[in-house]
């Protein structure tokens, strides 16, 4: 029966022979490499302005091809790009973003003005008929008229 140490050394030697380990056996010693040539072949995925496999005439067309609106300040979008950053936001992206933000702000403003209780919570709002005359400061009908402190005989605007 083989010992554990021998099995570990054998596995280490196999990994070194395949080029997956560097000379120093460390925790991060597995080499990460780029895939080139036939290793890099993968599924046909939408990349760039074209969609689908190149031999598919239904998906791989120039119909509806959008390369950005150059007159509105967009950079032209290439047919294909690989391992490059995106060209930035296009005019359509900016318009859709502006429209969505305008709708959200309109909804928020409308509801803050007309239905603020939905956003801030409800509180009890009593009817005016629930208050008594005494709470509102209204004298009884049988009470004598209060003395009026007015300026009856003076011209308007001269008594202040």
Curated annotation (Swiss-Prot):
Which GO terms fall under biological process for this protein? mitochondrial respiratory chain complex I assembly
Give a yes or no for keyword Ligase in this entry.
no
Q: Indicate the principal place this protein occupies in or around the cell.
A: mitochondrion
| Any matching Pfam family | NADH_B2
Q: Which GO terms describe its cellular component?
A: mitochondrial inner membrane; respiratory chain complex I
Localisation per UniProt entry = Mitochondrion inner membrane
Membrane topology label:
Peripheral membrane protein
Name the record gives this protein: Probable NADH dehydrogenase [ubiquinone] 1 beta subcomplex subunit 2, mitochondrial
Question: What role is this protein assigned?
Answer: Accessory subunit of the mitochondrial membrane respiratory chain NADH dehydrogenase (Complex I), that is believed not to be involved in catalysis. Complex I functions in the transfer of electrons from NADH to the respiratory chain. The immediate electron acceptor for the enzyme is believed to be ubiquinone.
Arranged from A to Z, the UniProt key words for this protein are:
Electron transport, Membrane, Mitochondrion, Mitochondrion inner membrane, Respiratory chain, Transit peptide, Transport
Q: State the family it belongs to.
A: Belongs to the complex I NDUFB2 subunit family.
Q: Which domain of life is it from?
A: Eukaryota
Quaternary organization: Complex I is composed of 45 different subunits.
């Amino acid at each position: 029966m083989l010992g554990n140490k021998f099995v570990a050394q054998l596995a280490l030697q196999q990994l070194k022979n395949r080029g997956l380990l560097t000379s120093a056996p460390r925790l991060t010693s597995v080499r990460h490499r780029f895939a080139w040539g036939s290793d890099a072949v993968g599924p046909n995925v939408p990349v760039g302005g074209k969609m689908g496999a190149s031999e598919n005439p239904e998906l791989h067309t120039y119909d509806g091809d959008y390369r950005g609106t150059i007159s509105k300040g967009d950079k032209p979008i290439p047919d294909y790009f690989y391992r490059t950053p995106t060209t930035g936001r296009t005019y359509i992206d900016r318009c859709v973003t502006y429209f969505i933000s305008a709708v959200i702000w309109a909804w928020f403003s409308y509801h803050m003005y007309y239905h603020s209780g939905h956003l801030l919570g409800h509180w009890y709002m009593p009817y005016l008929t629930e208050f008594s005359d005494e709470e509102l400061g209204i004298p009884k009908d049988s009470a004598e008229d209060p003395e009026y402190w007015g300026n009856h005989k003076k011209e308007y605007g001269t008594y202040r």
